[in-house]
Amino acid sequence: MDSAAVELKDVRAFSVREKLLAYVELTKPRIAFLLVLTSAAGFYLATKDSFNTILFINSMIGISLLAFGVATLNQWVERDIDPLMERTEKRPLPSKRVTPTEALVFGLVQCAVAEAYLFFLVNGLTAVLGLVVIVGYVLVYTPLKTRTSASTAIGAIP
Protein backbone atom coordinates (compact mmCIF):
# COMPACT_ATOMS: atom_id res chain seq x y z
CA MET A 1 0.00 0.00 0.00
CA ASP A 2 1.14 3.50 -0.83
CA SER A 3 0.95 6.11 1.82
CA ALA A 4 0.33 9.68 0.86
CA ALA A 5 1.92 12.54 2.72
CA VAL A 6 -0.59 15.11 3.80
CA GLU A 7 0.40 18.67 4.55
CA LEU A 8 -1.67 20.22 7.28
CA LYS A 9 -2.00 23.97 7.36
CA ASP A 10 -3.06 26.19 10.21
CA VAL A 11 -6.63 26.92 9.21
CA ARG A 12 -7.79 28.78 12.30
CA ALA A 13 -10.09 31.55 11.25
CA PHE A 14 -9.63 34.94 12.87
CA SER A 15 -12.39 37.43 13.47
CA VAL A 16 -12.31 40.71 11.59
CA ARG A 17 -11.36 42.45 14.83
CA GLU A 18 -8.45 40.04 15.47
CA LYS A 19 -7.22 40.49 11.90
CA LEU A 20 -7.42 44.30 12.10
CA LEU A 21 -5.58 44.32 15.42
CA ALA A 22 -2.87 42.13 13.88
CA TYR A 23 -2.45 44.63 11.04
CA VAL A 24 -2.24 47.50 13.53
CA GLU A 25 0.35 45.54 15.52
CA LEU A 26 2.43 45.10 12.35
CA THR A 27 2.77 48.89 12.12
CA LYS A 28 4.31 49.19 15.62
CA PRO A 29 2.24 52.28 16.47
CA ARG A 30 4.14 53.20 19.65
CA ILE A 31 7.45 53.34 17.80
CA ALA A 32 5.80 55.25 14.94
CA PHE A 33 4.43 57.76 17.46
CA LEU A 34 7.93 58.39 18.80
CA LEU A 35 9.25 58.86 15.26
CA VAL A 36 6.48 61.33 14.48
CA LEU A 37 7.12 63.15 17.76
CA THR A 38 10.81 63.64 16.96
CA SER A 39 9.93 64.63 13.38
CA ALA A 40 7.46 67.20 14.72
CA ALA A 41 10.17 68.66 16.94
CA GLY A 42 12.55 68.80 13.99
CA PHE A 43 9.91 70.45 11.80
CA TYR A 44 9.26 73.09 14.46
CA LEU A 45 12.96 73.79 15.02
CA ALA A 46 13.55 74.08 11.26
CA THR A 47 10.76 76.65 10.84
CA LYS A 48 12.38 79.98 10.00
CA ASP A 49 9.43 82.29 9.57
CA SER A 50 5.78 81.49 10.11
CA PHE A 51 4.72 77.97 11.02
CA ASN A 52 2.98 76.27 8.06
CA THR A 53 0.26 74.20 9.72
CA ILE A 54 -0.89 72.45 6.54
CA LEU A 55 2.66 71.44 5.59
CA PHE A 56 3.25 70.27 9.17
CA ILE A 57 0.12 68.08 9.19
CA ASN A 58 0.93 66.62 5.75
CA SER A 59 4.50 65.92 6.83
CA MET A 60 3.38 64.09 9.95
CA ILE A 61 0.80 62.03 8.02
CA GLY A 62 3.41 61.05 5.42
CA ILE A 63 6.00 60.22 8.06
CA SER A 64 3.43 58.14 9.97
CA LEU A 65 2.60 56.13 6.86
CA LEU A 66 6.31 55.66 6.16
CA ALA A 67 6.99 54.49 9.73
CA PHE A 68 4.06 52.06 9.54
CA GLY A 69 5.27 50.64 6.22
CA VAL A 70 8.88 50.25 7.31
CA ALA A 71 7.83 48.54 10.57
CA THR A 72 5.66 46.13 8.60
CA LEU A 73 8.42 45.33 6.09
CA ASN A 74 10.89 44.88 8.96
CA GLN A 75 8.67 42.16 10.43
CA TRP A 76 8.27 40.57 7.00
CA VAL A 77 12.07 40.37 6.63
CA GLU A 78 12.37 38.85 10.12
CA ARG A 79 9.49 36.39 9.68
CA ASP A 80 11.78 33.34 9.83
CA ILE A 81 13.68 34.31 12.98
CA ASP A 82 10.83 35.88 14.98
CA PRO A 83 9.27 32.48 15.86
CA LEU A 84 12.60 31.44 17.42
CA MET A 85 12.66 34.21 20.04
CA GLU A 86 10.32 34.40 23.01
CA ARG A 87 10.16 38.21 22.74
CA THR A 88 8.94 38.11 19.13
CA GLU A 89 7.12 34.79 18.80
CA LYS A 90 3.70 36.34 19.38
CA ARG A 91 3.98 38.94 16.62
CA PRO A 92 1.40 38.74 13.82
CA LEU A 93 3.57 36.74 11.38
CA PRO A 94 4.94 34.04 13.72
CA SER A 95 1.50 33.62 15.30
CA LYS A 96 0.02 33.25 11.78
CA ARG A 97 -2.54 36.01 12.32
CA VAL A 98 -1.17 37.55 9.11
CA THR A 99 0.40 35.65 6.22
CA PRO A 100 3.79 36.67 4.82
CA THR A 101 2.14 37.72 1.55
CA GLU A 102 -0.39 39.88 3.39
CA ALA A 103 2.37 41.55 5.41
CA LEU A 104 4.55 42.15 2.35
CA VAL A 105 1.71 43.69 0.34
CA PHE A 106 0.56 45.76 3.33
CA GLY A 107 4.08 47.10 3.94
CA LEU A 108 4.77 47.86 0.28
CA VAL A 109 1.44 49.64 -0.14
CA GLN A 110 2.03 51.74 2.98
CA CYS A 111 5.50 52.72 1.78
CA ALA A 112 4.28 53.52 -1.74
CA VAL A 113 1.39 55.63 -0.43
CA ALA A 114 3.76 57.38 2.00
CA GLU A 115 6.23 58.17 -0.77
CA ALA A 116 3.52 59.54 -3.09
CA TYR A 117 1.97 61.50 -0.22
CA LEU A 118 5.31 63.04 0.77
CA PHE A 119 6.24 63.82 -2.83
CA PHE A 120 2.98 65.50 -3.80
CA LEU A 121 1.91 67.08 -0.50
CA VAL A 122 5.22 67.89 1.20
CA ASN A 123 8.19 68.04 -1.21
CA GLY A 124 10.55 65.94 -3.29
CA LEU A 125 13.42 66.09 -0.82
CA THR A 126 11.30 64.63 1.97
CA ALA A 127 10.14 61.85 -0.36
CA VAL A 128 13.76 61.06 -1.32
CA LEU A 129 14.78 60.99 2.34
CA GLY A 130 11.83 58.68 2.98
CA LEU A 131 13.13 56.34 0.29
CA VAL A 132 16.56 56.40 1.92
CA VAL A 133 14.91 55.40 5.21
CA ILE A 134 13.05 52.51 3.55
CA VAL A 135 16.18 51.16 1.88
CA GLY A 136 18.44 51.83 4.87
CA TYR A 137 16.17 50.29 7.46
CA VAL A 138 14.64 47.38 5.57
CA LEU A 139 17.50 46.35 3.28
CA VAL A 140 20.55 47.34 5.36
CA TYR A 141 19.77 47.62 9.08
CA THR A 142 17.31 44.74 9.46
CA PRO A 143 19.53 42.07 7.80
CA LEU A 144 22.60 43.35 9.69
CA LYS A 145 20.89 43.01 13.10
CA THR A 146 21.70 39.30 13.19
CA ARG A 147 25.24 39.75 11.89
CA THR A 148 26.88 42.67 13.71
CA SER A 149 26.39 44.98 16.67
CA ALA A 150 27.36 47.86 14.37
CA SER A 151 23.81 47.61 13.02
CA THR A 152 22.68 49.65 16.05
CA ALA A 153 24.62 52.67 14.82
CA ILE A 154 23.37 52.12 11.27
CA GLY A 155 19.78 51.82 12.47
CA ALA A 156 20.07 55.11 14.34
CA ILE A 157 20.92 57.12 11.20
CA PRO A 158 17.43 57.69 9.77
Please place each PLM-identified region on the residue numbering.
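Membrane-embedded alpha-helical segments that form the functional core of polytopic membrane enzymes
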Residues: 37-41, 45-79, 87, 128-139
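Multi-pass membrane catalytic core of lipid/isoprenoid biosynthesis enzymes
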Residues: 87-128
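Cytosolic, membrane-interface loops and tails of multi-pass inner-membrane proteins
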Residues: 2-18, 77-98
